[in-house]
């Protein structure tokens, strides 16, 4: 079974893509990372930083998660991210996404030993 940490990497990590020229990025990535298997996932964020830099966020600023849990952490610095948002005219399994790049602080939930990101909570 895929671990929570591995699932986070599959769903949210894309360190190699520092600049995305293609408006098709989300359509391709959401499919290749299996995020459209049983439905069109409405929103997903990819982080274009090294895994080590994202894992380090677990030891940065502790903040409350959206669900009220206390194991979320906000990055000290802004990170290069891409937001993928379902466009509203998807016809599953043909999911259509809008690709938006941003530089924002990320908030992740962490757990386990080693203490690593298991959930992408927000970007601010």
From Swiss-Prot:
Q: Where are glycans found on this sequence?
A: 34
Please give the name of this protein: Ribonuclease pancreatic
Q: In which tissues is it expressed?
A: Pancreas.
Q: Where is this region: Disordered?
A: 1-23
Q: Which GO terms describe its cellular component?
A: extracellular region
State one molecular function term (GO): lyase activity
Q: What cystine linkages occur within this chain?
A: 26-84, 40-95, 58-110, 65-72
Catalytic activity reads: an [RNA] containing cytidine + H2O = an [RNA]-3'-cytidine-3'-phosphate + a 5'-hydroxy-ribonucleotide-3'-[RNA]; an [RNA] containing uridine + H2O = an [RNA]-3'-uridine-3'-phosphate + a 5'-hydroxy-ribonucleotide-3'-[RNA]
InterPro entries reported for this sequence: RNaseA, RNaseA-like_dom_sf, RNaseA_AS, RNaseA_domain
Q: What class of enzyme is it?
A: lyase
CDD domains in the record, alphabetically?
RNase_A_canonical
Question: Which gene specifies this protein's sequence?
Answer: RNASE1
Q: Which UniProt keywords apply?
A: Disulfide bond, Endonuclease, Glycoprotein, Hydrolase, Lyase, Nuclease, Secreted
Location comes to: Secreted
User: Which residues are recorded as binding substrate?
Assistant: 7, 10, 41-45, 66, 85
Q: Which family does it belong to?
A: Belongs to the pancreatic ribonuclease family.
Is Glycoprotein among the key words of this record?
yes
Q: Which GO terms describe its biological process?
A: defense response to Gram-positive bacterium
Q: Which PROSITE patterns match?
A: RNASE_PANCREATIC
SMART domains for this protein: RNAse_Pc
Q: Which organism is it from?
A: Alces alces alces
Query: Does the keyword Secreted feature in the UniProt annotation?
Result: yes
What the protein does?
A: Endonuclease that catalyzes the cleavage of RNA on the 3' side of pyrimidine nucleotides. Acts on single-stranded and double-stranded RNA.
| Subunit description | Monomer. Interacts with and forms tight 1:1 complexes with RNH1. Dimerization of two such complexes may occur. Interaction with RNH1 inhibits this protein.
Highest taxon in the source lineage: Eukaryota
């Amino acid at each position: 079974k895929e671990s929570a940490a591995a699932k986070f990497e599959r769903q949210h990590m894309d360190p190699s893509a520092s600049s995305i020229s293609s408006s098709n990025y989300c359509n391709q990535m959401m499919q290749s990372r299996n995020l459209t298997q049983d439905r069109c996932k409405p929103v997903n964020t990819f982080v274009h930083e090294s895994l080590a830099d994202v894992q380090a966020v677990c030891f940065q600023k502790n903040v409350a998660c959206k669900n009220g849990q206390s194991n979320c952490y906000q990055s000290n610095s802004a990170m290069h991210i891409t937001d993928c948002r379902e466009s509203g005219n998807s016809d599953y399994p043909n999911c259509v996404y809008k690709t938006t790049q941003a530089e924002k602080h990320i908030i992740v939930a962490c757990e386990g030993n080693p203490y690593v990101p298991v959930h992408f909570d927000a970007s601010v």
